[in-house]
Each structure stands twice: as C-alpha cells, then as structure tokens.
C-alpha cells in the first residue's frame, strides 16, 4: 500500500493544535488595506479555528498531521 500524499497547499495553511483542531490565518489582510477600518484589520489579526463542518476535509488533506 503506497503512502498517502499530503496536500502541500493545506500543509502551509493549517497548523494542528494540541486538542486536535486546526488553526488558520484569516482572509482579507493581504492587500488593499487602506479602505479597511483599523478595527476590522485588528479583528482579522488573530488565528481562527477550522469549523466543525470543514474539519473532515482538512484532516483528509493532512493525513500525517
């Protein structure tokens, strides 16, 4: 049986936490930032957790995480 390949794009975007969840960076903080409010940018700064509905997809992409 061959090894399962890790989806490299997912490996760069998600990190596993101690409890088994996955954290990721929020979107909308890369460019065109002048028109976005400081409060909005501040709230986008901390990492977010992958929702329960998407968790299975992330686990399938990262078999060895």
UniProtKB/Swiss-Prot annotation:
GO molecular function: structural constituent of ribosome
Gene Ontology terms: cellular component: cytosolic large ribosomal subunit
PROSITE patterns referenced in this protein's UniProt entry, alphabetically: RIBOSOMAL_L35 (PS00936)
A Pfam match: Ribosomal_L35p
Keywords annotated in UniProt: Ribonucleoprotein, Ribosomal protein
Keyword presence, Cell membrane: no
BP GO annotations: translation
Membership in a protein family: Belongs to the bacterial ribosomal protein bL35 family.
Entry-linked HAMAP family: Ribosomal_bL35
Name of the protein in its database record: Large ribosomal subunit protein bL35
High-level lineage: Bacteria, Pseudomonadati, Pseudomonadota, Gammaproteobacteria, Enterobacterales
